[in-house]
Amino acid sequence: MLYLTKISNAGSEFTENEQKIADFLRARVSELKSVSSRQMAKQLGISQSSIVKFAQKLGAQGFTELRMALIGEYSASREKTNATALHLHSSITSDDSLEVIARKLNREKELALEQTCALFDYARLQKIIDVISKAQFIQITGLGGSALVGRDLSFKLMKIGYRVACEADTHVQATVSQALKKGDVQIAISYSGSKKEIVLCAEAARKQGATVIAITSLADSPLRRLAHFTLDTVSGETEWRSSSMSTRTAQNSVTDLLFVGLVQLNDVESLKMIQRSSELTQRLK
């Protein structure tokens, strides 16, 4: 029996609660392996017995049988379409509906945040915040999506009084790196940790006596080996991706935490500067 087809075609026959169940199953069929009737009931705000009755209404003995059948139907459908479906990003294909794409993207980002936060060594993080707070000058380096994360952090740090350079041009990044000195900090953002431009800048900064802080993945890399301190990020993106979406999410969680930690260190003055910035920008409207 094709339960997915039956669910799609029987909409007018469903009660309000049954329609909730049907919508859930259609939208999240790819995730059913990890979903129990208890979880479904809690999320939908209905009883478990309603889910069992729904399964029986469709001809299954219970939710477990319906769930396994739906998983089987979904897998068979994927096998048929995989030959023609184009992989757009990570696990997202051209056959996915916008609702499925939204769920996949959200879950990818949620996992990146959860796994990155689980790795935090808060004592080391506090030490890094202290080092940055004492920096005479801060350089932030990054390429592509990492450069966007760096630029966002640079704006935040400038807002609370830090002297920061964050240039997109790699030649300028290298030029700034060689001019750093002891007491300065370079924050290098690279998930792979192997981009030659970023590694070159880190080498130059370290040679000049600056402290190098790397925001990178757990993988062994040239940048990781060069850095005095590392802040680890985790991303579930596969090698095939159209953009560094969950990677950037993980990196932003780290840089936002650094910013708030720095605000907390000097809260009164930082909040005054943030307020002044807000007042000035309001005058531009």
UniProtKB/Swiss-Prot annotation:
Residues 128-268 form the SIS domain. GO terms for molecular function: carbohydrate derivative binding; DNA binding; DNA-binding transcription factor activity. Residues 1-77 form the HTH rpiR-type domain. Pathway: Amino-sugar metabolism; N-acetylmuramate degradation [regulation]. Residues 37-56 bind DNA. GO terms for biological process: carbohydrate derivative metabolic process; N-acetylmuramic acid catabolic process; negative regulation of DNA-templated transcription; regulation of carbohydrate catabolic process. Gene3D superfamilies: Glucose-6-phosphate isomerase like protein, domain 1, Winged helix-like DNA-binding domain superfamily/Winged helix DNA-binding domain. Pfam families: HTH_6 (PF01418), SIS (PF01380). InterPro entries: Homeodomain-like_sf, HTH_RpiR, RpiR-like, RpiR-like_SIS, SIS_dom, SIS_dom_sf, Tscrpt_reg_HTH_MurR, WH-like_DNA-bd_sf. Represses the expression of the murPQ operon involved in the uptake and degradation of N-acetylmuramic acid (MurNAc). Binds to two adjacent inverted repeats within the operator region. MurNAc 6-phosphate, the substrate of MurQ, is the specific inducer that weakens binding of MurR to the operator. This is HTH-type transcriptional regulator MurR. It comes from Escherichia coli (strain B / BL21-DE3). The gene is murR.
